[in-house]
């Protein structure tokens, strides 16, 4: 009889825990973070649920608390890659540069094929202007993932490291491989404009506009090239299109004014 009671108790406990986990997942899916935290705090939570709690805390802007929760998990489970990645994300938000790099590096040591951790590690190096390190890592990453995102990060690192010609060739190779990558088109267009190669900027951006004439980033470089080349009527039309799409940035308004004044 006692065995039956024990089995019933265990079965009931498992059922309640499963129901609670399902409720947590539903609340997370609905971004109802307060409910997530309340449900998890009501029971002795597993590491997986504590990670969900950390995500909820981060979603509510309580990033320091989220990091503390994750650090407790990492003490108990130092090889939990999800907890390590989430801790790195929290450190990034809290401007804890070295700590974030350390967490990403740990994930990369545990799993050298972890593309996301390697990408974020490299991007963090770039954001903190460690361009040489970012270039080295982006080259290594490109051997595993030749996506436009990775190749663009390589080109940006070259640009930051004072390698403008190499970065131009890198952007060109990206555009040939991924013609729809508007960020690379805009970046290369910006380089052409900086070098006063306005014809190159116009040719590049007009080629992209033939498939998508609405992209704000590309149209900014296109309009700027026309303005700096003193083709003011076309520049005005491009800038008017930009402002009609809600672009009220300082440079757009400034060069629209310059174009009007020049005519």
Placement of each model-derived feature along the sequence:
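Register position in tetratricopeptide repeats
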Residues: 29, 59, 93-94, 127-128, ...
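Canonical tetratricopeptide repeat
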Residues: 52, 86, 120-123, 153-154, ...
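Canonical positions in the second alpha-helix
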Residues: 39, 43, 72-73, 106-107, ...
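Start-of-helix register in tetratricopeptide repeats
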Residues: 48, 82, 116, 149-150, ...
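Short coil turns that delineate tetratricopeptide repeat
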Residues: 44, 78, 112, 145-146, ...
């Amino acid at each position: 009889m006692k065995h039956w009671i024990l089995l019933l108790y265990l079965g009931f406990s498992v059922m309640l825990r499963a129901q609670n986990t399902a409720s947590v997942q539903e609340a997370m899916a609905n971004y109802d973070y307060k409910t997530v935290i309340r449900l998890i705090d009501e029971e002795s939570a597993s590491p997986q649920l504590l990670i969900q709690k950390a995500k909820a805390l981060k979603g509510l802007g309580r990033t320091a608390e989220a990091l503390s929760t994750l650090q407790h998990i990492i003490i108990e489970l130092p090889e939990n890659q999800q907890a390590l990645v989430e801790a790195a994300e929290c450190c990034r938000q809290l401007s804890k540069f070295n700590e974030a790099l350390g967490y990403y590096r740990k994930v990369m040591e545990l799993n050298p094929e972890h593309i996301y951790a390697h990408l974020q590690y490299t991007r963090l190096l770039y954001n903190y202007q460690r361009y040489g390190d970012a270039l080295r890592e982006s080259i290594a990453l490109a051997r595993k993932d030749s996506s436009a995102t990775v190749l663009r990060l390589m080109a940006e690192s070259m640009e930051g490291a004072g390698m403008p010609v190499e970065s131009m060739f890198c952007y060109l190779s990206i555009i040939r491989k991924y013609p729809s990558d508007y960020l690379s088109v805009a970046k290369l267009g910006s380089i052409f404009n900086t070098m006063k190669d306005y014809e190159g900027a116009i040719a590049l951006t007009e080629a992209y506009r033939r498939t998508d004439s609405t992209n704000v980033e590309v149209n900014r470089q296109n309009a700027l090239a026309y303005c700096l080349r003193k083709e003011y009527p076309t520049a005005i039309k491009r800038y008017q299109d930009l402002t009609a799409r809600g672009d009220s940035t300082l440079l757009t308004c400034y060069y629209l004014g310059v174009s009007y004044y020049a005519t």
